[in-house]
Amino acid sequence: MPAIQPPLYPTFLLLILLSLIITLYVWIISTITYKTAVRHAALHQRSFSRWSLDHSL
C-alpha cells in the first residue's frame, strides 16, 4: 500500500516551492501593473488639465 502513495515530504516541498513561485509572480506583476497604472493616471491627468485649460481660454 505505501508504494502507491507518493512520499509526503517531496510533495510538501514541491507545494511550498510552487506557492512561493506563484506569490512572487503575482507580486511582481501587481507591482508592475500598479506602477504603470499610476504613471498612466498621472499622464492622463496632466494632459486632461492642459486640455481643459486650453479650452477655457
Swiss-Prot record:
Interacts with host TNFRSF1A, RIPK1 and IRAK1; these interactions interfere with host NF-kappa-B activation at the level of receptor complexes. Interacts with host protein UBQLN4. It is a single-pass membrane protein. Pfam families: SH. Coiled coil: none annotated. Residues 30-57 are intravirion. GO terms for cellular component: host cell plasma membrane; membrane; virion membrane. It comes from the Viruses. Keywords: Host cell membrane, Host membrane, Host-virus interaction, Inhibition of host NF-kappa-B by virus, Membrane, Transmembrane, Transmembrane helix, Virion. The chain crosses the membrane at residues 9-29. Belongs to the rubulavirus small hydrophobic protein family. It comes from Mumps virus genotype B (strain Miyahara vaccine) (MuV). It is found in: Virion membrane; Host cell membrane. This is Small hydrophobic protein. InterPro entries: SH (IPR001477). GO terms for biological process: symbiont-mediated suppression of host NF-kappaB cascade. The lineage of its organism: Viruses, Riboviria, Orthornavirae, Negarnaviricota, Haploviricotina. The keyword Transmembrane helix applies. Residues 1-8 are virion surface. Plays a role in the inhibition of the host NF-kappa-B pathway. This inhibition occurs at the receptor level, by preventing the signaling of TNFR1 as well as IL-1R and TLR3.
